[in-house]
Amino acid sequence: MSDQQLDCALDLMRRLPPQQIEKNLSDLIDLVPSLCEDLLSSVDQPLKIARDKVVGKDYLLCDYNRDGDSYRSPWSNKYDPPLEDGAMPSARLRKLEVEANNAFDQYRDLYFEGGVSSVYLWDLDHGFAGVILIKKAGDGSKKIKGCWDSIHVVEVQEKSSGRTAHYKLTSTVMLWLQTNKTGSGTMNLGGSLTRQMEKDETVSDSSPHIANIGRLVEDMENKIRSTLNEIYFGKTKDIVNGLRSIDAIPDNQKYKQLQRELSQVLTQRQIYIQPDN
């Protein structure tokens, strides 16, 4: 029964607005407390922003940079609140983490023109793993509010030769938009999308891990953007057009009347015009 309840709960969460995930998740846990751990580990939540007091830069919070009640900043590598024995990446991986944060900071500025990004890496037995987080929220200046949250979890398995690596990327994007205009009123549109991909890439000085991961994330985000634009927003536009006619109703009625008259004329011509013997 618990497996069926979990499947139903996850299916319900996929259909609810992303901007209300925390409230809906809390309500579900109150209804079925036994699903608490499974739901918290399975449902991606909107990213929260914190401020690194050491360097004065924002960073994003998630389970991957949390240890107890403290979160590690990718900029200063310090936990807030301070934690003496918190989990830390190895020296080699920390150097890679710093480079990745600088690279994706530029990527975020180029593609999103604002927002906050963070990259966290951790060691594995035969390689390493990491998460790339990007958050961009609209300020509502054009009567449009919204938020984009993308979570890219990548696992890197380094081959024994050291010249190639296997990359496994799992990406989740949560997007919601809200418009409030005099002509159309208030409209909410949102959803989440998760995609996976795996690929082997050459690792060299000209194509290091950061470049390979960057290309994978860039390709994945472009595909997800295209899917959201063509399927979700495109389908919504079709539904709205089906509910509300763009043309004025009187003009539409005149067009249908003209169709009927033309049909009658053509029918009469078929009856009275006989072929020559």
Swiss-Prot record:
<dbReference type="GO" id="GO:0008290">
    <property type="term" value="C:F-actin capping protein complex"/>
</dbReference>
<keyword id="KW-0117">Actin capping</keyword>
<dbReference type="GO" id="GO:0030018">
    <property type="term" value="C:Z disc"/>
</dbReference>
<comment type="subunit">
    <text>Component of the F-actin capping complex, composed of a heterodimer of an alpha and a beta subunit. Component of the WASH complex.</text>
</comment>
<dbReference type="GO" id="GO:0098685">
    <property type="term" value="C:Schaffer collateral - CA1 synapse"/>
</dbReference>
<dbReference type="GO" id="GO:0071203">
    <property type="term" value="C:WASH complex"/>
</dbReference>
<keyword id="KW-0206">Cytoskeleton</keyword>
<dbReference type="InterPro" id="IPR037282">
    <property type="entry name" value="CapZ_alpha/beta"/>
</dbReference>
<dbReference type="GO" id="GO:0051016">
    <property type="term" value="P:barbed-end actin filament capping"/>
</dbReference>
<dbReference type="GO" id="GO:0014069">
    <property type="term" value="C:postsynaptic density"/>
</dbReference>
<keyword id="KW-0963">Cytoplasm</keyword>
<dbReference type="GO" id="GO:0005829">
    <property type="term" value="C:cytosol"/>
</dbReference>
<keyword id="KW-0009">Actin-binding</keyword>
<dbReference type="GO" id="GO:0008154">
    <property type="term" value="P:actin polymerization or depolymerization"/>
</dbReference>
<dbReference type="GO" id="GO:0051490">
    <property type="term" value="P:negative regulation of filopodium assembly"/>
</dbReference>
<dbReference type="GO" id="GO:0098686">
    <property type="term" value="C:hippocampal mossy fiber to CA3 synapse"/>
</dbReference>
<dbReference type="InterPro" id="IPR042276">
    <property type="entry name" value="CapZ_alpha/beta_2"/>
</dbReference>
<comment type="similarity">
    <text>Belongs to the F-actin-capping protein beta subunit family.</text>
</comment>
<feature type="modified residue" description="N-acetylserine">
    <location>
        <position position="2"/>
    </location>
</feature>
<dbReference type="GO" id="GO:0010591">
    <property type="term" value="P:regulation of lamellipodium assembly"/>
</dbReference>
<dbReference type="GO" id="GO:0016020">
    <property type="term" value="C:membrane"/>
</dbReference>
<dbReference type="GO" id="GO:0030863">
    <property type="term" value="C:cortical cytoskeleton"/>
</dbReference>
<dbReference type="GO" id="GO:0005903">
    <property type="term" value="C:brush border"/>
</dbReference>
<dbReference type="GO" id="GO:0000902">
    <property type="term" value="P:cell morphogenesis"/>
</dbReference>
<dbReference type="GO" id="GO:0051015">
    <property type="term" value="F:actin filament binding"/>
</dbReference>
<keyword id="KW-0007">Acetylation</keyword>
<dbReference type="InterPro" id="IPR019771">
    <property type="entry name" value="F-actin_capping_bsu_CS"/>
</dbReference>
<dbReference type="InterPro" id="IPR043175">
    <property type="entry name" value="CAPZB_N"/>
</dbReference>
<dbReference type="GO" id="GO:0022604">
    <property type="term" value="P:regulation of cell morphogenesis"/>
</dbReference>
<dbReference type="Pfam" id="PF01115">
    <property type="entry name" value="F_actin_cap_B"/>
</dbReference>
<protein>
    <recommendedName>
        <fullName>F-actin-capping protein subunit beta isoforms 1 and 2</fullName>
    </recommendedName>
</protein>
<comment type="function">
    <text>F-actin-capping proteins bind in a Ca(2+)-independent manner to the fast growing ends of actin filaments (barbed end) thereby blocking the exchange of subunits at these ends. Unlike other capping proteins (such as gelsolin and severin), these proteins do not sever actin filaments. May play a role in the regulation of cell morphology and cytoskeletal organization.</text>
</comment>
<dbReference type="GO" id="GO:0030032">
    <property type="term" value="P:lamellipodium assembly"/>
</dbReference>
<dbReference type="GO" id="GO:0030027">
    <property type="term" value="C:lamellipodium"/>
</dbReference>
<dbReference type="GO" id="GO:0007010">
    <property type="term" value="P:cytoskeleton organization"/>
</dbReference>
<dbReference type="InterPro" id="IPR001698">
    <property type="entry name" value="CAPZB"/>
</dbReference>
<dbReference type="GO" id="GO:0120212">
    <property type="term" value="C:sperm head-tail coupling apparatus"/>
</dbReference>
